[in-house]
């Protein structure tokens, strides 16, 4: 995989995920108790043999850059391997990135310097496991200008994605970004074929496409809206279907865009299913992250004699449960749960203390929050709405470092 450069787009604001993104980039949002969202894309790169990686950052990137430094400084520069965080360089003028394609256009000099033949473009804010090596093999075998990873979804969900039409040879003949009436599959009127935002370009094709797009004042400088539709006319754009038997990943067919509070919450809750739809336990595809060296989680009796209990939950290192009850929840590292506190259907980020007698239901508590004793969250929507953001599905979000 020496001939391919990987570019991860990690600079979006993620405003729909507010307040979790008020002080961090979306790819840096904690997920699954111990991970960050970007860890899943980076892990895919690691296990797929991709060793030249640029992470394009922009919006409130300090937390993301720190995570990359602490958890992902693992490649060997002497072998030409690297993961490099690239903030906006302003080499094309004093403007921020104006779209996904514009972000890479501003860094064309890095692509040229890499001497790679192919460029893989990935998003840093999706949750999935995928071996990219078979996709590159198909791209080369097809002599493709562009290969787009795709999957089929319900037509109602397809409105949020780029929808593709392909022939029997997987050649893409149509592409429309976020249509109100998505075209359905020929053999299934309820399903549409959508882009996953995973692309492999031949280097010269990408360079030329970005230069032409930058000169077009009418362009929104977006891959889905501008670059891909124009390349389809060349007849050299192919689809690669996700969720097959190719590659080393167990077939779990799980891919989620966690762009809203509700989708983020549900993706976390998916991990608590009796048989999770995404397998975190495949031994030869471990999800890498940075994790502080806390001692193992423990339960202990409280002064009143209550035993700390965990039921169908994911618990990270450093957690101490002193007589509280945690059910169907995800608890991140270094959390303290005090006597008679109950946590149900919730996500607790790092360094949180839950006071005695608290009742937390259907909520997300961001980092560095001390919840006072006997506080109730998720039980009274009117009271919660006066203090916190509540999602469409009723998930209450307590922001980072909130003071009660």
Swiss-Prot record:
Belongs to the bacterial/plant glucose-1-phosphate adenylyltransferase family. PROSITE patterns: ADP_GLC_PYROPHOSPH_1, ADP_GLC_PYROPHOSPH_2, ADP_GLC_PYROPHOSPH_3. HAMAP family: GlgC. Gene3D superfamilies: Hexapeptide repeat proteins (2.160.10.10), Spore Coat Polysaccharide Biosynthesis Protein SpsA, Chain A (3.90.550.10). One of its GO terms (biological process) is glycogen biosynthetic process. Pathway: Glycan biosynthesis; glycogen biosynthesis. It comes from Vibrio vulnificus (strain YJ016). InterPro entries: ADP-Glc_PPase, ADP_Glu_pyroP_CS, GlgC_bac, GlmU/GlgC-like_hexapep, NTP_transferase_dom, Nucleotide-diphossugar_trans, Trimer_LpxA-like_sf. Alpha-D-glucose 1-phosphate binds at residues 97, 162, 177-178, 195. NCBIfam families: glgC (TIGR02091), PRK00725.1 (NF001947), PRK00844.1 (NF002023). This is Glucose-1-phosphate adenylyltransferase 2. It holds the Pfam family Hexapep_GlmU. The keyword rRNA processing does not apply. PANTHER family: GLUCOSE-1-PHOSPHATE ADENYLYLTRANSFERASE, GLUCOSE-1-PHOSPHATE ADENYLYLTRANSFERASE-RELATED. It catalyses: alpha-D-glucose 1-phosphate + ATP + H(+) = ADP-alpha-D-glucose + diphosphate. One of its GO terms (molecular function) is ATP binding. Involved in the biosynthesis of ADP-glucose, a building block required for the elongation reactions to produce glycogen. Catalyzes the reaction between ATP and alpha-D-glucose 1-phosphate (G1P) to produce pyrophosphate and ADP-Glc. Keywords: ATP-binding, Carbohydrate metabolism, Glycogen biosynthesis, Glycogen metabolism, Nucleotide-binding, Nucleotidyltransferase, Transferase. Homotetramer. Its EC number is 2.7.7.27. The keyword ATP-binding applies. The gene is glgC2.
């Amino acid at each position: 995989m020496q001939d391919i450069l990987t570019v991860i787009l990690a600079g979006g604001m993620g405003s729909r995920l507010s307040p979790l993104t008020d002080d961090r980039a979306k790819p840096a949002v904690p997920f699954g108790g111990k991970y960050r969202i970007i860890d899943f894309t980076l892990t895919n790169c690691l296990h797929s043999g991709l060793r030249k990686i640029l992470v394009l950052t922009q919006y409130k990137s300090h937390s993301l850059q720190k995570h990359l430094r602490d958890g992902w400084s693992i490649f060997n520069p002497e072998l030409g391997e690297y993961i490099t965080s690239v903030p906006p360089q302003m080499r094309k003028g004093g403007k921020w990135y104006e779209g996904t394609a514009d972000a890479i256009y501003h860094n064309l000099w890095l692509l040229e310097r890499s001497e790679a033949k192919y460029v893989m473009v990935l998003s840093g804010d999706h949750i999935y496991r995928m071996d990219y090596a078979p996709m590159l093999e198909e791209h080369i075998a097809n002599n493709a200008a562009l290969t787009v990873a795709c999957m089929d979804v319900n037509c109602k969900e397809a409105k949020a994605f780029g929808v593709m039409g392909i022939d029997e040879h997987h050649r893409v003949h149509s592409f429309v970004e976020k249509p109100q009436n998505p075209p359905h599959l020929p053999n299934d009127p309820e399903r549409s074929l959508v882009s996953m935002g995973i692309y492999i370009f031949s280097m010269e094709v990408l360079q030329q496409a970005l230069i032409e797009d930058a000169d077009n004042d009418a362009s929104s400088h977006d891959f889905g809206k501008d670059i891909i539709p124009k390349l389809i006319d060349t007849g050299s754009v192919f689809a690669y279907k996700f969720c097959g038997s190719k590659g080393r990943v167990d077939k779990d067919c799980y891919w989620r865009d966690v762009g809203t509070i509700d989708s983020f919450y549900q993706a976390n809750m998916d991990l608590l299913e009796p048989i999770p739809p995404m397998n975190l336990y495949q031994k030869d595809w471990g999800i890498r992250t940075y994790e502080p060296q806390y001692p193992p989680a423990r339960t202990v009796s409280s002064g009143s004699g209550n035993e700390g209990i965990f039921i169908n939950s994911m618990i990270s290192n450093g957690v101490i449960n002193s007589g509280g009850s945690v059910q169907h929840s995800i608890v991140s590292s270094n959390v303290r749960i005090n006597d008679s506190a109950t946590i149900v259907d919730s996500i607790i980020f790092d360094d949180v203390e839950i006071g005695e007698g608290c009742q937390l239901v259907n909520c997300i508590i961001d980092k560095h929050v001390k919840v006072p004793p006997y506080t109730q969250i998720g039980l009274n929507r009117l009271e919660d709405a006066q203090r916190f953001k509540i999602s469409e599905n009723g998930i209450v979000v307590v922001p980072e470092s909130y003071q009660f």
